């Protein structure tokens, strides 16, 4: 038993029922009844007609049993090692007392400042050494030989 689908309403058409409509371009449509056929021929949109399957699908009618509650993904905190530091090292640092951590931070800052000062001092000495030889040898002015030419002969120009 072959069951067709109505081209307009979307309902099943059982054998012995419905009408077939062949357009001049060769496309064939099956309609459940004259109501569907007349609605199709008057160019009505099945998505805007309440009783059609397309309307019910568009407006989500009659699907309440199938809908499951959407599960939201929850972010789970996970601790793992980072490159250059193992998990044990990270946990040890985290469990340190704040005073110890503060002292370590200050010591690191002090060391960085000292290194910066040393770098600047070495830079200063290098600059002073570079400047000294330039002052010792001043350049002498080159005297260009003046070309003595014969007196000009002629008029104004």
UniProtKB/Swiss-Prot annotation:
Residues carrying Phosphoserine: 86, 149
InterPro entries named among the record's database cross-references: L24e/L24_sf (IPR038630), Ribosomal_eL24 (IPR056366), Ribosomal_eL24-rel_N (IPR000988), Ribosomal_eL24_CS (IPR023442), TRASH_dom (IPR011017)
Modified residues (N6-succinyllysine): 131
Post-translational modification note: Mono-ADP-ribosylation at Glu-4 by PARP16 inhibits polysome assembly and mRNA loading, thereby inhibiting protein translation.
Residue numbers bearing the N6-acetyllysine modification: 27, 77, 93
Subunit structure, interactors included: Component of the large ribosomal subunit.
Protein name per its UniProtKB record: Large ribosomal subunit protein eL24
Gene: RPL24
């Amino acid at each position: 038993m072959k069951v067709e689908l109505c081209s307009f309403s979307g309902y099943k058409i059982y054998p012995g029922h419905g009408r077939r409509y062949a357009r001049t371009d060769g496309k064939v449509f099956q309609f459940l009844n004259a109501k569907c056929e007349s609605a199709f021929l008057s160019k009505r949109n099945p998505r805007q007609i309440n009783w059609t399957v397309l309307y019910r699908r568009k407006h989500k009618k009659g699907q309440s049993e199938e809908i499951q509650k959407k599960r939201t993904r929850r972010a789970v905190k996970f601790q793992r090692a980072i490159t250059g530091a193992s998990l044990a090292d990270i946990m040890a640092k985290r469990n340190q007392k704040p005073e110890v951590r503060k002292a370590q931070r200050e010591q690191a800052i002090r060391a960085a400042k000292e290194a910066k000062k040393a770098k600047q001092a070495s830079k200063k000495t290098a600059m002073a050494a570079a400047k000294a030889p330039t002052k010792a040898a001043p350049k002498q002015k080159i005297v260009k030989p003046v070309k003595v030419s014969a007196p000009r002969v002629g008029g104004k120009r």
